[in-house]
Each structure stands twice: as structure tokens, then as C-alpha cells.
Amino acid sequence: METFILSSDSDDDCPPPPKRRSIEGVPKSFDGDKKMRFSFDVTRDIILEDSEAPCSSNNIFTPSFRRDSNKTLLKTPVSLRRRSRSMNCMTPIVDTINEPPINQVCSAFVQKEIQLDDDDDDEKESSTEHADDDLNLRALLSPEKKKRKEKVDKRRPFGVEEVQNEFYGVYCLISRSERQCYKNRCYIGYTVDPNRRIMQHNGGRFKGGAKKTDSRGPWDMVCVVHGFPNHVAALRFEWAWQNPAVSKSLKEKQLKKERKETPFAYQLRIACELMNSEAFSRFALTFRWLNTKEELPFPISCTPPNHVKLRYGKVKKEMSLVPAKSADYVAMGECRLCGKDIEKLWGLVRCISQSCHSHFHSKCLAEHGLKNKNEYADQIYPLKSNCPICGHFYLWGDVVREQRRIIKVSTKCAEEFRNKVVRKDLPHREISSRLRLKK
């Protein structure tokens, strides 16, 4: 069997180099290949010695080479025939896709709904013509998202607006886990709704609970300190309660847990120290026991301040009604101390007594309270004082809380009542939590 042996780097006249490997089945000349990668899809015809194979456009991958007349062309091995051809001159065959016009992509369905034909025949013809287009357009148009239905409180009267009174509290939890390493541990947190927050902690992280309380419960919310003027003050109290060794208010006292002191008794002592500190002692705070079974006496060395209220039971949401009648609003009027008109609603405060209807400038009432307590040179606002008109005792924190409720109602009321003050004798609605028991 005759073979044609030639190196791909050699010329026709020159013999191949002595130490260069020759490849069987590789043609000698690449003149007709147009500098493309050689393909082994060769023909089986016998080519004369002096003739050259024509290179046509239809057969650009068929190599042209010269061979001896006495030699026959060797059949290309199967392993070499499987190699790919050059991709330089190959054009991909792509099926044409009938895409809809741009102006019909987003408006085809809209136009079909708007244009109403009078004749039934025209409607049938248009439906058959656009039947194929509709199938293609359905993949291009995104489905419409269903709007979530707004939750309506069934306990609220229909058509009556309400605003929730502000609540900022810092609570303490106790673990009831059966595992000894987690039992009786305490956790300090901040919340605006204690009834909802305790369910989140017992539900785990997927229900909104904290990382440190996940799979370490069940937890009991024992007590909560509330009455802060805003969320910033409450968060500062929470951080100081969690980090007594680093807090500016307590780091000088170096509070440490005693040997026979329980974890909750230690946390209660820290809370009492914070309520007596300079940063929080002038707030109208309330200490509430949520679980009376865990009630402990306050430490003798640091009892809460006298103005701090002590309460028992669960926290209830208070909702203030937004009245729609003009009879439920009163004019701002003039200040009962300076006699000048009150121009802005945010500068108005009033006595918290139900029988007194006096309005004051916030600056005037604060100066009056500071002068009575001889604190005008040291403080900005009084801790507690008496109304100059009726003599009713008040805490400044309660006065500010009432002012914020008035402003909150004014943002929800009608435009004609924006510069008026809502009456204080309107009823408030309390919402008690409904805990879902597991079956």
C-alpha cells in the first residue's frame, strides 16, 4: 500500500529535515488553502502530478496538492476525519425569527381592548390574524402583580381616623429553657410594642426574634421601662443597660454581679442605677412589672427616683381619634402667662388636667417651672411643677407627650383644622393584645 509522506513545513523541491517527524496523510502543499487551517476532508480522486486542484468558492475546504502519478491518494484515517474545519470562512446558519414590531410589543393587548369593532365579521378576522402574534407576545409581557389588600382593623369604627400614642420601652427577658446553660439567662431589648415583641422572640429568628434569643427559650418578659420622650433616649438606655462597664453613666461605679445574686437581680440593680443617673433621672419614666411572679424588691442602695411611676400588668395600645367635626377642635388662643398669641402649633403646650383648658408657650411654661424650683440657671426644662392657673401637679415629660399627640392628630385631620387644637376630653381607645395559643 503506497503512502504519501511529507512534513507540513517542507517545500515541494526540498526534502524534509532529517530529524523532523513526518505525518502520514498530510498533503505537501497549502497553496489552495488560502492560509486557513488545514482540514482533512480530502477527496478520493487521483490527481495528476503536474496538475493542481482548482479552488472554487464551493469547495474552499478541499485542499489542493500535487502528487506523483504512480502514487495513489491514501484514505484519511477516521481519527483525522473527525477534526473540525476552519471557522474563518464558515457562516452560521440561523433560522429567521419573526419578531413582532416594536410598537406592538407592549400595546398589542391594549389596542385590542380599546378598539371595538361594530361588525362581528371584522372581529373574527382580526382574532384569527393576531392569534399567532398573541402567543408570541405573552412571553414578552410581564404578568400583572396582584395588589395586597390593606388590613382593616375591624375593631375601629368605619370612616374614623386614629393615631397611635407613642410608646418607647426597654424590656428584660428571662429564659425558661430546660438546658442548664441557658436557664434563667436575661436579655435586654428595645421595643415599641411589648406584646408583639415577646411573640417574635419565642418564634425564633424567622419570626423576627433576636439572634441571642433564638433556640434558647421559651422567654418571659418580666419588666419594661417606658415613658422616654423619643426612640433615641430609649435606645441609649438600652445600650447602657446592656453594657454597664462601658457606659458613661455607670462605668465609674464598676457594677459587678455579686456571688449570690441571680442574673435578673443583677439586671434590676443596673436598671435602678440608670434611672438615678444624670442622663435619665429627669425623664418621666414608668417601671412596669409584666410578670408579677418574678417581682423582686428594689435594691435598698439605689431605689428608683420618687417621680418614677410603678405600674403592673400588660401594656395596652392607646389610639387617639382624629375627629372630623369643628366642635371637637379649639383655637390656639393666647398664652396665659405672657398674654401673646400662640402662632405655631409646635410651640403650644397645655395643662394635662381634664378641668383646666389653659394654653401656654412651651418656653413660658418651662421658665415658670424652673423659677419655682430654683433651677433656672442650671436646667433647660423642669422635672415637675404645678400649673400656674389651676395648680395641678404635672411632670414635664407628660406635658411634652401631650404636645406630640396634638401635633400627630393635626397631621391626620382635615386641612381646615390644621391650625387648631384637638380637645382633650375626647375618648381614647385601648387595644389589648390577643395572643394566639398553639394547639
UniProtKB/Swiss-Prot annotation:
Q: Which residues form the GIY-YIG domain?
A: 166-253
Q: Where in the cell is it found?
A: Nucleus
**What spans are recorded as compositionally biased (Basic and acidic residues)?**
125-136
Gene Ontology MF terms in the entry: 5'-flap endonuclease activity; crossover junction DNA endonuclease activity; zinc ion binding
Q: Specify the enzyme's EC class, one word.
A: hydrolase
Sorted alphabetically, which InterPro entries does this protein's record hold?
GIY-YIG_endonuc (IPR000305), GIY-YIG_endonuc_sf (IPR035901), Slx1 (IPR027520), SLX1_C (IPR048749), SLX1_endonuclease (IPR050381), Znf_RING/FYVE/PHD (IPR013083)
Region of interest (Disordered), ranges: 1-28, 117-140
Q: Which family does it belong to?
A: Belongs to the SLX1 family.
Q: What is known of its domains?
A: Both the N- and C-terminal regions are required for interaction with him-18.
This one is known as: Structure-specific endonuclease subunit SLX1 homolog
Organism equals: Caenorhabditis briggsae
